[in-house]
């Protein structure tokens, strides 16, 4: 049983992780509704007085701690409100370039990439999707061909792990393809990677990227805080202050930054990631093996193996023939199991563009549900899911 979720079984970690306790927050004491420890540096980090400088010191300490975990320089990290804003800041900075070049993005990107690209296109910036294979991944050869086809492209956005299917991109080979294209043309190609579903789950090498986005709440940290890594500083789209080097103006979220630093140290250290990744693989190897025994069940994609290196072991997409995904989600919820149909950012949309890009037919797309696990997931959670599915299929 997932103790953090009480008597229910939470298997929607890709949407948000079960919160963990971390340093600056404690259980509420003395009527303090926020549970902030006495002495917390509450001042505005931009203020010159003692309280402000204490907050500034705490903010920069949090930045340095994050940098140590990610193995990058602190000055290349910028605190934001989360993955969506981090992605938007990078994309919209392209509007401020002297020459407006084309942007490429994988056809399975998170809505915060795809929808912002649509906005940029409406503003006159050319964009083009990169096709994916049936497993939802972008091949290095495909990226190379896309860059050859679009010689005016100077930007490529390809996520680390897909948030709906768990497809695991070979980022190293993709970056190599972008750099080779750059060497041939003599023109730079900015490589951006949405690492929201990768951080803390699979090994990542951020230093090779030009930019990357992260979110705390996917790791069990606070909502409303994220990170943007920039190898080279970009011009911010909006103004209103010099905070975060002008990349992200506005009074900084010191409490959130400390939360993010704490959760990165707890969940994203390389050895911790390796150990937890192995545990996750064993759990989902069991789950996928049991799902295969259910007659009306099919994995998406259909050739996903029980322990498949093409996929993150934290997310699996599965469908049940003749049962719409939302119907199965509601049926499982009544059985005490929380899953989803896909991205929480598009939960009100019946369309499944990620599955469509993978070549999944319309009916099968609508039958898909996403199961995603976390660090406290155990066999009892998976068995509850399997029992709930069997019960639902008995009357659906």
Label the predicted regions.
Residues 1-396:
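Pyridoxal 5′-phosphate
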């Amino acid at each position: 049983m997932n103790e953090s979720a009480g008597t229910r079984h939470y298997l929607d970690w890709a949407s948000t992780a079960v919160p963990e306790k971390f340093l600056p927050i404690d259980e509420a004491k003395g009527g303090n509704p926020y549970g902030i420890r006495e002495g917390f540096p509450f001042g505005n980090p931009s203020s010159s007085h003692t309280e402000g400088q204490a907050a500034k010191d705490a903010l920069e300490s949090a930045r340095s701690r994050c940098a140590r975990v990610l193995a990058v320089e602190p000055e290349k990290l910028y605190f934001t409100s989360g993955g969506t804003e981090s992605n938007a800041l990078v994309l919209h900075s392209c509007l401020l370039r002297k020459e407006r070049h084309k942007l490429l993005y994988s056809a399975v990107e998170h809505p915060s990439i795809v929808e912002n690209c649509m906005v940029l296109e409406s503003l006159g910036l050319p964009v083009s999707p990169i096709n994916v294979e049936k497993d939802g991944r972008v091949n290095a050869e495909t990226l190379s061909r896309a860059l050859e086809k679009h010689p005016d492209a100077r930007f490529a956005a390809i996520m680390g792990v897909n948030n709906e299917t768990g497809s695991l991109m070979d980022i190293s080979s993709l970056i190599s393809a972008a750099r080779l294209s750059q060497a041939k043309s003599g023109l730079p190609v900015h490589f951006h990677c949405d690492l929201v579903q990768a951080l803390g789950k699979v090994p990542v090498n951020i230093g090779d990227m030009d930019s990357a986005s992260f979110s705390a709440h996917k790791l069990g940290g606070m909502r409303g805080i994220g990170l943007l890594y920039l190898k080279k500083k970009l011009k911010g789209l909006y103004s209103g202050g010099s905070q975060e080097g002008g990349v992200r103006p506005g009074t900084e979220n010191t409490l959130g930054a400390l939360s993010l630093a704490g959760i990165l140290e707890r969940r994203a250290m390389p050895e911790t990631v390796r150990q937890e990744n192995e545990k996750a693989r064993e759990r989902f190897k069991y789950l996928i093996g049991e799902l295969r025994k259910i007659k009306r069940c099919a994995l998406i994609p259909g050739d996903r193996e029980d322990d498949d290196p093409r996929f993150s072991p934290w997310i699996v997409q599965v469908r049940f023939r003749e049962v719409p995904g939302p119907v199965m989600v509601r049926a499982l919820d009544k059985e005490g199991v929380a899953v989803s149909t896909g991205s929480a950012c598009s939960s009100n949309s019946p369309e499944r563009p990620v599955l469509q890009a993978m070549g999944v037919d319309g009916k099968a797309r609508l039958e898909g549900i996403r199961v995603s696990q976390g660090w406290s997931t155990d066999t009892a959670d998976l068995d509850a899911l399997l029992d709930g599915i069997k019960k639902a299929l008995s009357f659906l």
